[in-house]
Amino acid sequence: MADGPTLSIVEILVTAPWCYRGRALEEFRRVITRFTPHRSAQGQSAAAVVALIVQDLRMAHAFYTIGHGRRPIGEFVDLLRDVEVTLLADVRIVPRSRANPQYNEDALPQALQPFDIAYTHMTDLGGLRGRQKSVAPEINGFWENESFHNYADYAMSERFRSALAHLRERGRTQRCAIMCAETVWWRCHRRIITDYLLAAGETVFHILGPGQVEAAAVNEVAQLQGAGTLVYPAEPAS
């Protein structure tokens, strides 16, 4: 029997709390490489085994985003179950919909409960923010759309950072999906929440429809500042 970890360690680690972040993850990578045999019985290099373990760890604690749109509640629940979501974080500023009352705050939790999916409304991550007079317009000048610009300004606040930290904390013990009303992520403020999660080292996927899940990527314009703040400066005129 070979000394050190084997591929079965993946099954053990993906059930552990998600604590390998930043430097801690790099330390884990260093230690596991040292004690993994140079070649496994399957012919994989130690580096390949480490990459597999790290990938599975990230996947096990990934965040998802979803928009409810006009979907029937059954279809919506199926989308969450397909990726094994256990917590739905509602980031609508007003958790109600006249056109789709099945997504109202007084109805949605009951619809999710039989499937062991918890519900939480995170008001401080909600969209539809007003102009932030404390932030100069050029700081987030990339956003020509006023709603996105205002939200990018709001995301620089302590209130947003605190709410984001709470979301990440919940994501360490539950597989979390962030929900708003807009069906597609690129027309919703959850794209900015996604940027902040990715900048913090999280893994994020967008749920688009049945069998349609895509990996998220940080907006290429976003620049990370102190205290984990992102700015979106206007692109230089060509």
Predicted regions and their residues:
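Residues marking helix boundaries in flexible regions
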Residues: 10-13, 33, 54
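Residues lining hydrophobic/aromatic ligand-binding pockets adjacent to catalytic sites
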Residues: 53-238
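Charged/polar low-complexity intrinsically disordered segments
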Residues: 11, 26-28, 42
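Basic polycationic patches enriched in arginine
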Residues: 21-23, 29-30, 34, 39, ...
